[in-house]
Design a protein with these regions (language model features):
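Conserved catalytic phosphorylation-site environment of P-type ATPases
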Residues: 90-97, 130-134, 143, 193, ...
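Small-residue-enriched core segments of transmembrane alpha-helices in multipass membrane transport
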Residues: 64-67, 117, 259, 285-303, ...
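Bilayer-spanning, highly hydrophobic alpha-helical transmembrane segments
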Residues: 39-44, 252-279, 287-296, 305, ...
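Conserved ATP-binding TGD loop and adjacent catalytic N/P-domain core of P-type ATPases
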Residues: 412, 441, 447-586, 644-649
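Membrane-embedded alpha-helical bundles of multi-pass transporters
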Residues: 6, 13-14, 48-55, 75-78, ...
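Conserved cytosolic catalytic loops of P-type ATPases
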Residues: 136-229, 326-370, 409-410, 521
């Protein structure tokens, strides 16, 4: 059979040849199915010949050819594996076919080879089809790109792009690789990568990614990655590498299937030997061969891999990267979700919404002092403060006080910026409380130990946050918010989002400790930015990185990466994984049930070789078809709705 989607082959089942270099898109393109069809034609011709004009040499010749053609799909690879000391279902089928020939049942052997070759081909086709879901990301990259060479636009192959090249991207064209916009503005369609339907406005200095579709503007983009190392290629490489990690269902199936094959061979030998001593040798040898086929765990061995690859491929097309079967199964068991506030529940784009002053200071003076201390910081709060003022003078001797704020010198005077508690809010205490109740973070500004003012910075909730939280709670998930912000601000934002369990003023190690406590009670996922929340992500059963597109660290750190900025992908991924896990359980249960039913029927001679093969391979087709169902996932229905909420401030 075809190679397992994980990149490994299971000795219990997959005895087939390597997949064709080009993955088949149509049934007729599968070589094994073409051979199976030819085998079926020969077998049918032998039956017609036996009925219409019984020349037995012709009939036997047709059956022998049907057997040879069908067996060519699994016997060569089975013998090769046997020489390497490995046995699988193909080995069982080979023994059964040879045994049937030895007993003079050439028609039975040909039927077995024909039916088994069909299942081999169907599995190869299904595996290739599901694998294409992930690999389809690479097809988003165009074969050619336009670059500036010595001032002239030149068309080159995407594989010939080098870091530093200047790409020209015209309206409607896809970006051939990652880069930074040097000139031009446009709205990029990134739906095929992140699953978000709303185009993203970009301009000079913005980072853009391979596979994005340019809107109406003409862009000049500086190339930052080659075709082999762009964001899409790295994503596919990371996910495919992680697919070797197997989940509980796959490990269970492997634990049953691998030892089952040699056990079946031993049991069949005992049945044949004991039956030959106590009864008719021919009858019991034939029954032993039927038992050999009846207990073959091929459907069991493919029950999970086909489902895993179909599910991961479908999710990847909507901007949800699930790193392997283990991550998929764990995602399907999650019952509690811990959400980081900044960058997950909020957009991580804070703005200054209010400035309160005292001791004769002006609004601009307060902002100028704060900006001087934050001038060299890249913290989101610093970005908000710097964007709110035109002041450009930077403070000197700036030192950070962990968990408190900044201290430095400006125009020869000592200035401080920090949270209430480290600095005394004094007469601004009521203003600070009002800011925090409005969901803002308040910072105080002081000069020469004299309070100048308080600045309120608020990072707005994502418009879809309340909808997502409500959906999670309706689905039975326990939702908790974790943040390093103060209690008042955290409580205000949590109330807007509909979250009841809130933990504030947490350091990274505190978040990890709380996640570990949640995990001790029930399966828990931690959702964060994948970088600053690394300890908490590692402490959870499953780490989910939000907005991971272009962030290699996030993709590598987390088990699941939501490539876009739409939080609705979180419940979408959870529901998809839960459904996929249910399909895995169905497949494993059906496979084991069929083996359990067929074994006694074969042992007591109720079913013959052809009937057992037919039932067994029909089961495999059902398992494959059921697994492919995991590839169905509905895209998000339009952009998130902005809630109508008024916040006092």
């Amino acid at each position: 059979m075809a190679a397992q989607p994980s990149g490994e082959t299971s000795d219990a089942c997959c005895d087939g040849e390597d997949n064709e270099d080009r993955e088949p898109e149509q049934l007729w393109q599968v070589a094994k199915l073409r051979r199976a069809a030819f085998s079926g034609v020969l077998l049918t011709a032998s039956l017609v010949a036996a009925w219409a004009y019984p020349l037995w040499p012709v009939v036997l010749g047709l059956k022998a050819l049907a057997l040879a053609v069908g067996a060519s799909t699994f016997v060569p690879s089975s013998l090769k594996r046997l020489a390497e000391g490995r046995v699988g279902v193909g080995t069982l089928m080979t023994i059964a076919a040879l045994g049937a020939v030895a007993l003079g049942e050439l028609g039975e052997a040909a039927t077995l080879a024909f039916l088994f070759s069909i299942s081999e081909g169907l599995e190869e086709y299904a595996t290739a089809r599901t694998r294409r879901g992930l690999r389809a990301l690479l097809s988003l990259v165009p074969d050619q790109a336009t670059v500036l060479r010595e001032g002239t636009e030149t068309i080159v192959a995407s594989t010939e792009l080098h870091v530093g090249d200047q790409m020209i991207v015209k309206p409607g064209e896809r970006l051939a690789t990652d880069g930074i916009i040097r000139a031009g503005r446009t709205a990029l369609d990134v739906s095929a990568i992140t699953g978000e339907s709303v185009p993203v406005e970009v301009g000079p200095g913005d980072e853009v990614f391979a596979g994005s579709i340019n809107g109406l503007g003409v862009l000049q983009v500086g190339v930052t990655a080659t075709a082999a190392n762009n964001s899409l290629a790295r994503i596919v490489h990371i996910v495919e590498a992680e697919q070797v990690r197997k989940g509980a269902s796959q490990r269970l199936a492997d634990c049953i299937a691998r030892p089952l094959v040699p056990s079946i061979m031993i049991a069949a030998a005992l049945i044949a030997g004991t039956g030959s001593v106590l009864g008719n040798p021919l009858v019991w040898i034939e029954r032993a061969l039927v038992v050999l086929v009846a207990a073959a765990p091929c459907a069991l061995a493919i029950a999970v891999p086909v489902t895993v690859v179909a599910s991961i491929g479908a999710a990847s097309r909507l901007g949800v990267l699930i790193k392997g079967g283990a991550a998929l199964e764990t995602l399907g068991t999650i019952r509690a979700v811990a959400l980081d506030k900044t960058g997950t529940l909020t957009a991580n784009r804070p703005v200054v919404i209010d400035v309160a002053t005292t001791n004769g200071a002006t609004r601009e003076e307060v902002l100028a002092v704060a900006a001087a201390l934050e001038a060299r910081s890249e913290h989101p709060l610093a970005v908000a403060v710097l964007a709110a003022t035109q002041a450009t003078t930077a403070a000197s001797d700036v030192q950070a006080v962990p968990g408190a704020g900044l201290i430095g010198r400006l125009d020869g005077r000592v200035v401080r910026l920090g949270r209430p508690g480290w600095l005394d809010a004094a007469e601004l205490a009521d203003h600070v409380a009002c800011m925090q109740q409005a969901g803002a973070t308040a910072v105080l500004v002081e000069r020469d130990q004299q309070l100048l003012g308080a600045i309120a910075v608020r990072d707005e909730l994502r418009p879809e946050a309340a909808e997502v939280v409500a959906g999670l709670r309706t689905g039975g998930y326990q939702v908790t918010m974790l943040t390093g912000d103060n209690h008042a601000t955290a409580a205000a934002l949590a109330a807007q989002a509909g979250i009841e369990q809130v933990h504030a003023e947490l350091r990274p190690e505190d978040k990890a400790h709380l996640v570990a406590q949640l995990r001790a009670r029930q399966p828990t996922a931690m959702v964060g930015d994948g970088v600053n929340d690394a300890p908490a992500l590692a402490a959870a059963d499953l780490g989910i990185a939000m907005g991971a597109m272009g962030t290699d660290v996030a993709i590598e750190t987390a088990d699941v990466a939501l490539m876009g900025q739409d939080l609705r992908h979180l419940p979408q991924a959870l529901d998809h994984a839960r459904r996929s896990r249910q399909i895995m359980v169905q497949n494993v249960g059906l496979s084991l049930s069929i083996i359990t039913v067929l074994m006694p029927l074969a042992l007591f001679g109720i079913l013959g070789l052809a009937a057992v093969v037919l039932v067994h391979e029909f089961t495999e087709v059902i398992v494959i078809a059921n697994g492919v169902r995991a590839g169905r996932i509905k895209p998000l229905a339009g952009p998130p709705k902005t809630p109508d909420r008024t916040i006092p401030g």
